[in-house]
Amino acid sequence: MTTTGTILDRANQLLLAGVVEERNKLAVSCNSSETTLTMSYALGSLRENTVFEIGSEMMFVWEANSTSKTVTVERGYGGSVAAAHTAGDIATVNPRFPRGQMLTALNAELSDLSSPLNGLFQIKTVDLSYNGSDRMVNLTGVTSMIDLYDVRYRYLNDDYPVVRNVRLLRDMPTADFASGFVLAFDSYVRSGTVRVIYKAAYGTLATEATVLDTAGVGTELEDLLVLGIQIRMVAGREVKRNFTESQGDTRRADEVPAGSVTNSINNLLRLRRDRIIAEASRLTRQYPLRFRK
């Protein structure tokens, strides 16, 4: 099964477009609080006032000792989370696209895809034990819901008739309905098991080891997520070229005019739009609109 780290790797390879970033290796394992780290090879560009990345954690270098190959660092730099690392882990020096930021971009993309404008979603189910008398029932375990898709009750083990005249109520008092989501019955339903099928937003991918399936993301979305990460990571890079107090990277106006970085994602935006339309069409075919009478 595909992990979050695999998606980040694919996006990073496309973003770098063949550029090889400077790397080193951690020589000795460290916990999440150690501030003196030992590297396996010559420090190279690892010097004072630079940053490097191991996994999704960024570190700021306060001091570097080229003789002992050690660096004194600030852990969890730039909003990243300090973590334990193992000897042999790769340290990327001054990464162009920090993996922690890429993970944030990935989760932002998942949230955006679930918006009504884009129309993508995952299908989830919850089974309720209904007593046949309560008019409103708490949707146990539901934390997020876009809309109801289908409601059925178990008449026999091979017969689940549709329950009609039901409504979804949101933001109900949690003192009475723990989830805040309520299924309201406007007509009689016999006691038994009621299966609720609903549309939900995609979940959050917490770490690089998280499997996409846990967030409701199928293999069909993998290329779309890679596109989203690329677009979000490149979108803000033009800003630093417009600082007025100092000159940034040398700009060859004839070859790389102002706006070139921003314009470089135009084709990606078009491809993303087409892929969203295609995925929305697939979901509409699999889960067509239903009318309850």
Residue ranges and their predicted role:
Residues 35-38:
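Short glycine-/aliphatic-rich beta-strand segments at the starts of folded cytosolic domains
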Residues 1-31, 42-59, 63, 67-70, ...:
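Glycine-enriched, solvent-exposed interface loops adjoining structured elements
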